[in-house]
Amino acid sequence: MDQGVNIKKSAFATFLIIATAWMFDALDVGLLSFIMPIVGKAWGLANSQTGLISSVSTIGMICGGFYFGHLADRIGRKNTLIITLLMFSLGNVVLAAAVGFKSFLVIRFFVGMGLGGELPVAATYIADLYQGSQRSQMLILADSFWAIGWLIASFLSFLLSTTIGWRGLLLVTALTGFFAIMMRRNIQEISHVQTQHVALGQALKKSFHGKTVLLWIAWLMVMFSYYGMFMWLPSIMLARGNSVIESFGYTTIIVVAQLPGYYLAAWLAGKIKIKYVFAIYMLGTALGAIMFGNVSSSALTVLAGCILSFFNLGAYGAIIALTPTLYETDVRGTMTGMAQGMGRIGAVVGPLLVGVWIDQHVSINMIFLIFMISLIIGSVAVLALPEPGKNEGAHAE
């Protein structure tokens, strides 16, 4: 019994170390959303140019998801996780020295590659570590670290943006990344997972079915709505008459609402099928989106934002939990990386379109109506997914 307890404790300690991947991804995305209006003002950028910063970063994430997801199946999860985090940390050091808009874009692409590769590999590692409904619950709990990363980004921006500036914030992020690398050196590869030299084309041929198309549609809709809404959240707050400090403060409150959303989703994952959890949360997000687009006062904006945050991030956690269960171990990293990479196409388009729409004076309520429709499409796509086969998502195939 003592040995079993020790194994569980060891697995949970490993889980906590791996879950920091979500924290760093959110820390970077959150800081970027706070930095964007500051950099835009300093360099005299149009809204469409500001949106391009986020989109170029996300293009890097797409490339990182495709490449590093496949690499994890070839050289192992642990080594790939360390490589991606090193790329993220060094990239932020260089980014802090950017001298203009063009150099900022180029460096953000490589930072994005590190981030985009880290998250699917971390999800694959946790999927290898657990089985059954516990796998879904632990993946959703891992995704709750996203909220912690956003909170850290909010507090750093609130407390330090006026003292050390956006360059200093990036250096702080890089330092935390280097610390995480030291922690990940001590984790072990999952013993039953063997690295495979499966070519990317072979992996696609083996696993590309109708379910993959439906899954990619769901990922597209989740990331299109999430990045489109949340990357512009501080800017929308500013446009509604709030100061920079008020905007950061309100955004922090909205981010806190993510945590109970995650925990309820994790609990539901132990009670009902994960695809139903996803659909419920996507429809809840759609409700929050239409509310957020049609309110004007600060109090109602924060309330609608909390509803949006509660459901949208729970849906994000649910689809992260769902994806690895659809594929066998030898292609799990590749297909999880590809699914997230395809989803990040939506993450590119979302912020870019919002910037263009704002420049063209499209109303906020119309923009959020579009997000509501996309969320409904995503929920329908997942509900249409077939149930996993007996070998799919198994602990060892």
Regions found by a protein language model. Give the residues of each.
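C-terminal membrane-cytosol helix-exit motif in multi-pass small-molecule transporters
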Residues: 175-193, 378-386
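Helix-breaking motifs and short loop linkers at transmembrane-helix boundaries and internal kinks
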Residues: 44, 76, 97-103, 295-296
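Cytoplasmic helix-loop-helix junction between adjacent transmembrane helices
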Residues: 107-144
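Conserved MFS/SLC helix-loop-helix module at the cytosolic interface between two early adjacent transmembrane helices
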Residues: 63-99
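Helix-loop-helix hairpin linking two adjacent transmembrane segments in secondary transporters
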Residues: 141-185
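Paired small-residue
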Residues: 91, 102-110, 299-307
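Interfacial helix-cap and linker-helix signal at transmembrane-aqueous boundaries
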Residues: 39-40, 71-72, 156-162, 237-238, ...
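Extracytoplasmic gate region of multi-pass secondary transporters
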Residues: 32-33, 208-262
